């Protein structure tokens, strides 16, 4: 009587092992491919998010440059001696701060939030209590302020702040609410804003009102500014007349931190921003 053996033979086991290795190899290859795709997408997403935040903040400062809470036609009194901040607002609301051409940008403007006044002298203003209950919530001693109406503006420094009153120096030629060329209801007070945008290392930084720089985005490997003057169709890093600048082109290169196939993800961005005080 013949005995029949059942089960796997050596050859069958070897074939099964080879097939298993092939399946495992294919699965590992798919895993590696997915991992590389994830790293590439993650790096690109971070770059795009950094660029979005950077351009949003830079654009806000450039658009506001040269502007106040009042008319763009407002000017200090003709007999008033301009200080450095007033001169900057009038003649160079955007500039390169004397740095190497195209490497830095400085923008000056009034703050976005401005407050109405109900009374004024040549060295103080009384704020509208229906708009702000305590002036200390908005201003502090040493703040640079813009006082303006539809006809004039001045940049002053706060010397004292109480519940409803802000005192300042230097004194204005006349009380802002008795200007015969502008109604008292148009008088506003806001903080003066001076910002400097620059690159340090691989970071994009902003310094506000002379304070230490704060990093806005990392991975910024290149940053440049170019300016278009009124009546021109070209952009240049060295404009011949800062008062005539009406738009700024911001070029930025961002590089990710993750490597894919031994290469880092890098993208170039460019955006053009107009100065509202010069174009509206």
Regions inferred by a protein language model and the residue ranges of each:
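Aliphatic-rich helix starts adjacent to a transmembrane/signal segment
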Residues: 2-59, 63-65, 261, 279-280
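Acidic surface patches and DE-rich sequence motifs
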Residues: 4, 149, 229-230
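Residue-level preference for short coil/turn positions at secondary-structure junctions
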Residues: 6, 141, 243-246
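Autoprocessing Asn-cyclization modules and mimics
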Residues: 82-178
